[in-house]
Amino acid sequence: NRMKTETRAICPPEHVWAIMQEPYEKGFSDWMVEGHDCFARVLTHHVPSNDPKYTASHPAIPWHVNRTFDQLTVCPVPEKTRGLSWVIGDAMDLPGHIRRWSFLEFIRKAGLPIDVYGKKIQYIEDKWDGLAPYRYSLAVENNSGPDCWTEKLADCFLAWTLPFYYGCTNLENYFPKESFVRIDITRHGESLEKIRTIMAGEAWEKRISALREARDLVLHRYQIFPHLSRLIAAQPEESMKKADLTIPPYRRSARAFWNRTGYKLKKKFGMLEPRR
């Protein structure tokens, strides 16, 4: 996220890394493409240049279900007594937020049986309760592009729930293709038909092994600790001199300022996403 305060550290400058965990949207998250001089390495799903400091990476956002690593590693498959759920946020800051709510409105009007949870809909204290009892759930990212998948997907896997997924365009590079079902929420009717067809075919029962593999990958490879540990271990073992470093907060450039101004105007006048 955007650095709002100054940070100090005593370490080699080569050991100062950043990992980007927000979707990139011009005028909304410009810190993802500028202000990186103090970082030796930037892990990001949106690589802004061919500078070798940039490494393509998923955001490695922590899971949101209220379970520890130890609990999740021994968790059996929960009893699946319900069909389809969607745990949805209430933000409306990005075009992806608007697309998501538009799709929710469509499937509700179409009469799709679904339990929807969220701060402004049906609040639940623990996201686990909106996933674990369900065979299927919708996992819809804030944007669509390579390498950008988040806890929206990981939480489904951890709860042994098959996700109808929209977002990361190269997700097959990370997880078994049978562990999720792709939908395109910009194609309302097509996505609705796919959801109905998959659920009618009892796909969840047939994909348990793929879900098991996917959740093991989340726990042991892709969550932030093993992810960073693997990257650090791959670094050359060199003796580097420590320094007293100051990492400044992000300050928008003039270009980013005007990008931000334009974005705010588009949001104010409802122009972030074309009306259907």
Regions found by a protein language model. Name each.
Residues P23-E25:
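Blade-loop segments of beta-propeller domains
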Residues N1-M20, D30-K120, K127-S137, P146-R276:
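Pol beta-like nucleotidyltransferase catalytic core
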Residues N142-S144:
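Active-site-proximal helix/loop microenvironment
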